[in-house]
């Protein structure tokens, strides 16, 4: 919302965005949501409450496939809600999964579960009469959707690599602690959705403030050498540093100010890699997390939401100034960055044995969409059947995939046989398909300008043909497609990134790398799928013939001069 409101009489202070007024007048996120729930004349919420329900983990959407048809029939759009669960670190138990699966089948328009790039799941197509029911179900399961959207700290993600399960457990515990510590303290969620007793007017938000944050805030924890969480896509990232003598994490490198969204036509917006602040000990993580959040709370831009993210605050005030303020407020000094190396960002598919002698099976879930829509791939049914017999846990990855975790040696065959029976495991999936992902886009995302999730599978097939033509079947290029420039599928950290411009047309970005530490550059703007395929055929052919040993596609297109590397996106992204 770009409207402004006058918050004071000092004409030297910029007007605040209207979102700030909505938050300020919401009575700690209550607004008139409860009254709107009882309004049966519309399937949605009014404009202000549609903003506030985001803080409760929901987005108001409509089915864009039927928008014109319904308008012709003089009907309002098919308004529905998308709910995103809070699931720090992406761990969910089989019995929780079964209940979610059953609810999605019975009470959503689409009957699917969507795994996200932030290690959680979304339910699309929730109608207003079912909203209280889904929140009550989550509460019964020990889950909620608090702060998975809105101007707050979002779902905290961490490396899901089961190969180092001792380290994974440590970062998962930390992810849960950070998530809980930074949650809104308002009782509005329980009052509205769980019919909890209304509290007296004693709400306060000592960390987030009564107007919460200027914009959404994202936190990730990575365990090198795996960068599956894409540390440079987050406002705040912790990179684990392991003891040389034990399987214990002794501290973290801290990165601040990453973010990938931009606005077409506005060169003051751009994707930005995070800045290295320094190394801290494990005991200081919560204090640093709180302080980075509060500095951004106080210094972030509340007048122009396009410039409200942490990355723009760092650009405006300077990295050194922001870092010094964090040290001053927290009393924690940053030490020099400890050495670390990222070598990969993908998931390890198939069976992997953990150090506790249990096994972990990583399943490829194309675009994270779990459904029974394909009769040859009954993902929903197969995973539900496994949940009925599995005594371990499920882990959702930041690459939209699913890990069946904690499987005993005796149960491996039974679980794998079940998954093969329903087509969940397919040995023919190529490395290229496994390295590709897309955001949801049409028909439910209101921001989508072009297809993404529904476009990607057939597009990947065409890329597979190109790879095969040049005998690159065993190789993979990090490919990401988003329906708009917000980069929910992290296209601005891919080797090949497509961002939607209009139906059937995309911007093509090249030159990111395969470990997520370089932003790609715009190669061609507003082009068709055929244009994209022709460009990729040519550049992949050259890569096959001219590459150095083990050189990735992204590194090749930079070295060969097809695109210039983005070094400092604040200055050279639009060159």
Curated annotation (Swiss-Prot):
Coiled-coil blocks: none
EC number(s) given by UniProt: 1.8.1.2
Keyword Cell membrane tagged: no
Cofactor, free-text remark: Binds 1 siroheme per subunit. Binds 1 [4Fe-4S] cluster per subunit.
PROSITE patterns linked to this entry: NIR_SIR
Broad EC category: oxidoreductase
Positions contributing to [4Fe-4S] cluster binding: 439, 445, 484, 488
Claim: Amino-acid biosynthesis is one of the keywords in the record: yes
A single BP term in Gene Ontology: cysteine biosynthetic process
InterPro entries per the UniProt record, alphabetical: CysI (IPR011786), NiRdtase/SiRdtase_haem-b_fer (IPR005117), Nit/Sulf_reduc_fer-like_dom_sf (IPR036136), NO2/SO3_Rdtase_4Fe4S_dom (IPR006067), NO2/SO3_Rdtase_4Fe4S_prot (IPR045169), NO2/SO3_Rdtase_4Fe4S_sf (IPR045854), NO2/SO3_Rdtase_FeS/sirohaem_BS (IPR006066)
Recorded catalytic activity of this chain's protein: hydrogen sulfide + 3 NADP(+) + 3 H2O = sulfite + 3 NADPH + 4 H(+)
Entry keyword set: 4Fe-4S, Amino-acid biosynthesis, Cysteine biosynthesis, Heme, Iron, Iron-sulfur, Metal-binding, NADP, Oxidoreductase
Co-factor requirement: siroheme; [4Fe-4S] cluster
Family, similarity comment: Belongs to the nitrite and sulfite reductase 4Fe-4S domain family.
General function of this protein: Component of the sulfite reductase complex that catalyzes the 6-electron reduction of sulfite to sulfide. This is one of several activities required for the biosynthesis of L-cysteine from sulfate.
PANTHER family: SULFITE REDUCTASE [NADPH] SUBUNIT BETA, SULFITE REDUCTASE [NADPH] SUBUNIT BETA-RELATED
This protein's name: Sulfite reductase [NADPH] hemoprotein beta-component
Gene source species: Blochmanniella pennsylvanica (strain BPEN)
């Amino acid at each position: 919302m770009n409207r402004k409101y006058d918050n004071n009489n000092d004409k030297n202070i910029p007007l605040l965005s209207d979102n700030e007024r909505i938050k300020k007048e919401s009575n700690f996120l209550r607004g008139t949501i409860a009254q709107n729930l009882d309004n049966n004349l519309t399937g949605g919420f009014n404009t202000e409450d549609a903003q506030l329900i985001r803080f409760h983990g929901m987005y108001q959407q409509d089915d864009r496939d039927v928008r014109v048809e319904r308008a012709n029939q003089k009907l309002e759009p098919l308004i529905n809600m998308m709910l995103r669960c809070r699931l720090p670190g992406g761990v969910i138990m089989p019995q929780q999964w079964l209940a979610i699966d059953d609810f999605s089948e019975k009470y959503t328009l689409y009957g699917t579960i969507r795994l996200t790039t932030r290690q959680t799941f979304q339910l699309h197509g929730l109608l207003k009469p079912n909203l209280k029911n889904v929140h009550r179900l989550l509460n019964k399961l020990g889950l909620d959707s608090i702060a998975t959207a809105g101007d707050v700290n979002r779902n905290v993600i961490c490396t899901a690599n089961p190969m180092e399960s001792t380290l994974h457990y440590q970062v998962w515990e930390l992810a849960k602690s950070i998530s809980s510590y930074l949650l809104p303290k308002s009782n509005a969620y329980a009052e509205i959705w769980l019919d909890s007793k209304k509290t007296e007017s004693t709400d306060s938000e000592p960390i987030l403030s009564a107007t919460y944050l200027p914009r959404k805030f994202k936190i990730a924890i990575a365990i090198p050498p795996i960068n599956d969480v894409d540390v440079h896509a987050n406002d705040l990232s912790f990179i684990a540093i392991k003891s040389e003598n034990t399987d214990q994490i002794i501290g973290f490198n801290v990165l601040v100010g990453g973010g990938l969204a931009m606005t077409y036509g506005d060169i003051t917006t751009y994707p930005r890699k995070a800045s290295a602040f320094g190394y801290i000990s494990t005991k200081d993580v919560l204090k640093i997390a709180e302080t980075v959040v509060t500095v951004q709370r106080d210094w972030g831009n509340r007048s122009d939401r396009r410039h409200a993210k942490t990355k723009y605050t760092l650009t405006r005030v300077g990295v050194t100034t922001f870092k010094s303020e964090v040290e001053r407020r927290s009393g924690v000094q940053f030490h020099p960055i400890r050495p670390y190396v990222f070598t990969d960002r993908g998931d390890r598919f198939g069976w992997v044995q953990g150090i506790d002698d249990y096994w972990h099976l990583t399943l490829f879930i194309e675009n994270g969409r779990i459904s029974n829509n394909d009769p040859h791939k009954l993902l929903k049914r197969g995973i539900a059947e496994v949940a009925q017999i599995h005594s371990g846990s499920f882990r959702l990855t930041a690459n939209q995939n699913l890990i069946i975790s904690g499987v005993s040696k005796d149960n491996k065959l039974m679980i794998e046989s079940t998954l093969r029976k329903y087509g969940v495991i397919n040995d023919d999936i190529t490395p290229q398909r496994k390295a590709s992902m897309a955001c949801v886009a049409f028909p439910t995302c209101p921001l989508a300008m072009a297809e993404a999730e529904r476009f990607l599978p057939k597009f990947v097939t065409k890329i597979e043909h190109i790879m095969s033509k040049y005998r690159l079947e065993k190789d993979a290029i990090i490919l990401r497609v988003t329906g708009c420039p917000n980069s929910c599928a992290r296209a601005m950290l891919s080797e090949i990134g497509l961002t939607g411009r209009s139906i059937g047309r995309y911007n093509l970005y090249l030159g990111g790398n395969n470990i997520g530490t370089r932003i790609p550059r715009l190669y061609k703007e507003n082009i068709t799928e055929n244009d994209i395929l022709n460009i990729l055929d040519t550049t992949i052919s050259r890569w096959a013939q001219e590459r150095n040993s083990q050189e990735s596609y992204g590194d090749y297109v930079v070295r060969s001069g097809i695109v210039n590397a983005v070094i400092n996106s604040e200055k050279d992204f639009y060159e």
